[in-house]
Amino acid sequence: MRDGFIKIAAATPDLHVADCAYNTSEIVKLAKEAAAKGAKLITFPELCLTGYTCGDLFLQETLLEGALDALNTVCRETAELAAVIVVGLPLRVRGKLYNVAAVVNAGDVLAFVPKTHIPNYSEFYEQRHFVSADTLSGGMESVDIKNADGETVCVPLVTDTIFQCDEQPLFTFGVEICEDLWVPNPPSTALAQMGAHIIVNLSASDEIIGKAGYRRDLVRQQSGRLLCAYLYADAGFGESTQDLVFAGHDLIAENGALLAESKMFSQGIIYADIDLQRLAHERQRMNTFESIEGGVFSFSLEPVENDLADRTFPRTPFVPANKALRDERCEEILTLQATGLATRLRHTHAKTAVVGLSGGLDSTLALIVLVHAFDMLELDRKGILAVTMPCFGTTARTKGNAEKLAEAYGVTLKTVDIKAAVDQHFMDIGQSKDDLSVTFENGQARMRTLVLMNLANKNGGMVVGTGDLSELALGWATYNGDHMSMYGVNGSIPKTLVRYLVAYEADRTLGELSDVLQDVLDTPVSPELLPPKDGEISQKTEDLVGPYELHDFFLYYMLRFGYAPRKIFRAAHKTFAGVYDDATIKKWLTTFMRRFFTQQFKRSCLPDGPKVGTVTLSPRGDWRMPSDAVSALWLKEAESL
């Protein structure tokens, strides 16, 4: 279980009602197939050894004995599999019949887990045959059964108990059965609080119109509420269709996200690679996730390498892949940004808002947000003072785009050529114009901030910052230059998302505005602080610090889920295969780790700005890190990859 990943599987076998021998052969076949693909936890549907739709046959001695014989066969045939297998059967204990899950490992039944909530409404008549787990004395009893060798063994019948792997302590799971999920207080809630990172549900949920969507949402939302993985195996083909139809709707969800789903009315296996470290990190982070005491059964599994074949990592984790969802998200984000800014403008009684408009992505987004905020407040857009400040690195393309944007949005444009002021400043401090050092670059950035701040004072306004989350993570901002403003609207927006927000605005506008926004998107990302070559941008940010799609990927998994460098590298290797080789990924990952630590001092004094997503670097909110923290541990791991 390297890096906390474990493969789990839900299987729907072909069944014959009451034909335990046939059912067992199908279950064993699928169990072996899943184990061969690396699954460590394999679950089957409710009452799968007999079939769920046996009716009054559940009261027949022959069927009950056949179910136990079938369980012994499962134990014997799967004894060599490096996996835990969970199957369903009817089990008689002290004259009462329980609908149970049998947890099987290394040829033994670790325990039986009985169903708690026995439905007896609509099409369900389970109380005709089964009793609830609530009838157990103290929530636990035991039952003597014959094992595969013909020996009598005592197996516990338990509730409020989880199962934990000795070799992989994060591999913990609890079991509930079908209806248990559909009630106001499912057993899985307590099981998760006891420490179960995976909830297994053996189900026989019949299909009616609209139920699949409800079921899907139920599983997904329960996994999110419990910060767990939810493994749901549903009965399917072969169950009696006398009155009902079963679709074999298998589902695997993790922390609110659906990872795998079977095709309706099909048989077979679905898989997912679950990130147990991520789940543990989320529970640790959320101090409101309460823990309670419960029973624990341990089991042993030989650790096996996981190739992550059934795990995907979004290439742009901050940006939804689905266009409809992406557009919806973009609209929501722009509204959040604009509302935050509008509230601040109203509170400060600012008459104007000043923004440095370079013609690049970040300042364009800041202008878009400003326009939305002014429209919200029903203010004249002429109160927006867009300032272009050409200097040594400015190109005609970016300056022209800035001018076109100001005109298209109907805001006030002011041009302040800062070359003379910067020349004088360089003379004052003895800086040669031929020395293209950090002083040459930062002198321009700080001069621009000086101009903006003084214009804001002069016009009774406030400076709106343009820097984005990716730049803050890398420290790609001049301290007390573009780093500083009176309100930063982009501080929670990573560069990959900035691009999509501007593209969204371009898609919903017409004419010249759409054209100029598209040209902004096509312009290389650059601070334009070094002289151009042949009139073209010579200083390209991604050539210097690396591709933003990589840095945003690193940033997301480091901050959101606490991934270590080796785990980030592994995820990036899988995600960017064919795009970047391992050497390139390692190079920029090392750069990211180094810069992230050394540049914290800039983030420790950020201006106010709205939180937009779950990953942000505000020192007053989500990220509180000392400016003098040492990166040695992270760099050592990154450099050793």
What are these regions (language model features)?
Residues 1-356, 368, 372-381, 413:
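Enzyme catalytic cores with a strong preference for nitrogen-chemistry domains
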